[in-house]
C-alpha cells in the first residue's frame, strides 16, 4: 500500500516538473514572437498590437525554484518520507489559450516551413530538371558534333579511299598498258625476227636451191658431157677394138695355132683349140671374139718346155667393159695352171664384147692353156 503511494507521489512530482518545463518553454517562446509598436512622433496614435512581456528576472526565479524543487525531490528520494498525495494544480485558462496560440503559431510556422521546403524542393527539382535538360542538350550537341565529326571523317576517309582506289586503278591501267605495249613490242620484235629469219631462210634456201640447181645443172651437163665423152670413148674403143679385131682376124689365129695347124681365120676354119673356145664356126663374130680373149690372155702366158703334153683349163668372169672380175682353175697340173693363173691375173682386162648378145654368150669363157 505504501509502495503504491510512493509511486503515485513520484508520478505527480514528475508531472509537475514536466508542466513547469512546458510553462517555462512557452514563456520563452512567447517572448520570441511578441511585437512592439513604434509610435510615430510620440503622438500615441495608431493601432495597438497586444504583446506578452516576459520578465527575465521572474523567469530566472522560476527556473531557480524549479531547480530547488528538483533538488528537494532528489533529497526526498534519498531519505524516504511518507508520501503525501498532492492535488495537481488546476490549469490556468490563459496559459491554455496561450499554449494553444503557440501551438497554432508553431503549426502555421511548420506549414510555412513545409511549404517553403516544398518550394525549395520544387525549385531544386526544376533546377535539376533544367540541369538535366541542359546536360541532355549538351550531350546531344556533343553527340551530334561527334556524329558530324565522324561523318566528316568517314566522308574524308571514303574520299581518300576512293582517290586511292582510283589512283590504284589508273596505275593498274597504266601498268597493264605498259605491259601490253611491252608485250606488243616483244611480239612485234619476235615477229620481225621470225620474218627476218624466214626471209633469210628463204633467201638461203633460194640461194641453196639456185646453187643446187646450178650444181645439178652443172653436174647434169658434166654427166652428159662425161657420158657423151664416155660414150664417144667407148665408141672409139669399140671401133679400135673392132679394128684390132678386124686386124687380128685378118692376120691372126684362134687357139694359139695357125691356119695350117688347125687355126680358124675370118674366111672359115674347121678346128680350134680349147673346150669352150677351141671349136666353132669360123664365120661367126662370136667365135672371133673368143679368139681375141684367148690371144689377149695368152700373150702373158709364160711357156715352159716342161708343160709339153699338159693342158690347164681356167674359167674367167668378164664385165661388160671387158674387165676380168674373177677366175678359177677347172683342171690341169699345178705347174702349168700356176703359169696360166698368173697370166690371167696380169691381164686384168680384155677388149669389150661388140654387142650384148656376144657378151651374154662369152661373159664366162673357159680357156685352155698349153704349149702347142
Curated annotation (Swiss-Prot):
Changing residue 190 to R: In strain: 1479. The keyword Cell cycle applies. It is found in: Cell inner membrane. Changing residue 234 to A: In strain: 1479. Part of the Tol-Pal system, which plays a role in outer membrane invagination during cell division and is important for maintaining outer membrane integrity. It is a single-pass membrane protein. The keyword Translocase does not apply. Its main location: membrane. Changing residue 249 to F: In strain: 1479. Belongs to the TolA family. This is Tol-Pal system protein TolA. It comes from Haemophilus influenzae (strain ATCC 51907 / DSM 11121 / KW20 / Rd). Residues 1-8 are cytoplasmic. Residues 30-372 are periplasmic. InterPro entries: Tol-Pal_TolA. Keywords: Cell cycle, Cell division, Cell inner membrane, Cell membrane, Membrane, Repeat, Transmembrane, Transmembrane helix. The Tol-Pal system is composed of five core proteins: the inner membrane proteins TolA, TolQ and TolR, the periplasmic protein TolB and the outer membrane protein Pal. They form a network linking the inner and outer membranes and the peptidoglycan layer.
